Amino acid sequence: CVITIITRGDNEVLLAKNARNPRPVYGLIAGFVEVGETLEEAVRRETFEEVGIQVKNLQYLASQPWPFPSNLMLAFRAEYAGGDLVLQEDEISDAAFFKFDELPEIPFAGSIAHAMIMHVTQGHAVADDTKAWL
């Protein structure tokens, strides 16, 4: 799986609410890599499918074992490159760019999504060992 944190400018981050989660938690864009697809292609495809925007300047950040369904989450950072937010409503119920100091509720500490958001919005370092980072 790929999980991506998308920034716009120097102080905005894209966060999205999963349509299947009743809690008001905003997380990151994530999805499965398709057969024959590179990780970068998966990031671009999942981003466009789920929120309708283009991204550029992809950077690998870290990985985290994900037990359901026996996967590995590969974390990327990307920059907004264009397009209007158009939601894939069966996956995403809301998405917006939030100022770093005006974030909604985000995923729990210990999740790779939380660590990625803290890295981008508060400058927390990415550890060489992701388990130490989390």
Across the structure, where does each feature detected by a protein language model lie?
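Active-site-adjacent beta-strand/loop module that shapes the phosphate/pyrophosphate-binding cleft
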Residues: 64-87
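Surface-exposed, charge/polar-rich loops and edge strands
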Residues: 37
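N-terminal strand-loop-strand
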Residues: 1-28, 32, 54-55, 78-80
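Hydrophobic alpha-helical positions that pack around
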Residues: 29, 43, 47
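Short alpha-helical functional segments enriched in proximate histidine and acidic residues
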Residues: 50
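Nudix hydrolase/Nudix homology domain
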Residues: 22-26, 88-134
